[in-house]
C-alpha cells in the first residue's frame, strides 16, 4: 500500500452525539460489514458500552474505499473513548491519527467534552473538519450550530458535512472529505522501526494484543521487537489488521495501523503511549508524550458475603489485565472485614469497574466513600501521600495538608447559571470566568477541590440543570487546605470504616448529619448508646440511642415504696454494668448511610 493512499482518522464527539452509529454507517458503506454482521454500535464490544452509550476502550478498523478520483484508499478509523476520565487514552489515540471528524449533534450544539477533545486533537496537530449529525431531527438547527462551532472552537464550518447516521445521509460525502482534507501519514519505511502503542488488551489464548501505529519502518511476523519504557524484548508472533475482525497480514509498514501479538503476559508491560521498536536496530529517539497514568480517586471494595473474597481477588486481577490504569491492594477494616483499596482515573471509571465486577463476576459489593490523594507535610520535613482517613498521621505530627484541585468547565443553558454558581460556591470553588458562548449557552469555569467533586457534584449538577449541563475537568495542582480527620465514635470507640477527611469549616455540619442518620439506623439496645462525631479529642456532635427498659415494677401491686426503689436501683446497677461490657453490632445499612449523607 502506498503511504500517500493511507488516511488515519478518528471521530471526536460528545456522549450521545452519534459517533458509534456514524462508525457503523462508514463500515457498511465501505463493505467492511456484511448485512449479516450488522448490529448497532459494532465497535462498542462491551455490553456496558452499548447500554450506557459510551465508548470505553479504543477500537480500530481498516476500511477500503475507492474514491471519486478512481484511486483505492485505506482508511484507518481509530475509535476513541469520549469521556473525561479516559483523556489520556484519547490523547494517545489521537496521536496515532492525522485528522479527525468533529461530530456535533445538530440539535444540541457544542458540549464540554467535545471541546476538550477537539483541543487535544488540535494540540496533536490534527486536521479537523466538522460534521453535523442528526440533521433529520425536527429540532435540528444546522446554521446555529455551524455558527457555534466557528465562535467557540474557531473551526471554519461553512462547508460542514450535513449527515444523519441513523438514516445513512451524508456517508459518502464524509468519506470523500476524509480523503481530500486529511493529509496522508508521513513516515519512512526504510528507517528503523518506530511505532506508537495506543491500546493494549488481554486475550485469554494469545496473551496481550497491542494496537500500534507505525511511524517509521516495517514490522514483519517473526521480528524481534522491544518496548522502550521497559526495555523488554519479544518476538512478533502475529501481525495483522482489524477489518473489522482480526486478519493476519505479512507485514505492516510506516503509516499503517495494526495489531501485534508478541506473547506478552502482562498488560502492565504494554503501556499506552509507549514506543515499539526493533531489538537489533532500535530507533534513536522514542516518541514523546509517554506518561504513566496515575489513579486520582480511591475507594474501598468489600464483598458483602465474606466468602467471596477470593472471587473478588481473581476478578480484580482479570480486570487489571485489560485496564492498566486501575490499581488495587488488599486492605482490612474492623467493620467490613477483608477487601481491597482500589484506585481509579475518575468517577465514571470507578462506576464502570464496579458494575463490571457485579455483572461479569456476579459479586455483591459494598463500596466505601470515594476519596482522593492528599499530601501530608510532616513537621519533621518529609511529605507522604495518603488516600484514606486511616492513614492520616496524628495531628501533632502534621505541619499542613494539601489537596488536589481541578479546573472544571461547565457548559449550560443560561437559565441554570444561578444554581450552578451556588453549587460551586458550596463546594469551596474559586470562580475563574463566565463566558456567554451564545445568547443562551454559557460556559462557567471554576477551580474546585477534587475531594468535593468526587462525592456527588456531578449528580447534583445534573439535577440542578435537568440534565442539560455538561462537565469537563482537568487536574490543576495541589493546594494547602484546612483538612481534619473526623471520627465517628460509638460508646467511645472509634469505628475505623466511618472516619473521613473533611474541611474544617464543613466538619460540624457533616458530623451533625451523620450522627443523626446513625441514630435512626442503630437498633435500640438494653443500654443507651452514645454516637459521637469528634475531631481529635473534641466532640462536635452527639446523639443518644435511648435504652430499652423492662418494667421491673410490674409484679408489685401497691406495696411499699422502698421495695420499688430497691428494684429500680438494682436495674440501674445492671444497666451500668451492661454498658461497660456491651458492644454494638453496626448494621450494614449504617455504612451505606454514610455514603448517602454525601448524596
UniProtKB/Swiss-Prot annotation:
InterPro entries: EF-4, EFG_III/V, EFG_V-like, EFTu-like_2, G_TR_CS, LepA_C_sf, LepA_CTD, LepA_IV
GO MF, any single term: GTP binding
Topology in the lipid bilayer: Peripheral membrane protein
Keyword hit for NAD: no
GO biological process: positive regulation of translation
Recorded GO CC terms: plasma membrane
Residues reported to bind GTP: 16-21, 133-136
Catalytic activity: GTP + H2O = GDP + phosphate + H(+)
Pfam families tied to this protein: EFG_C, GTP_EFTU, GTP_EFTU_D2, LepA_C
Localization per record: Cell inner membrane
tr-type G domain location: 4-186
Name recorded for this polypeptide: Elongation factor 4
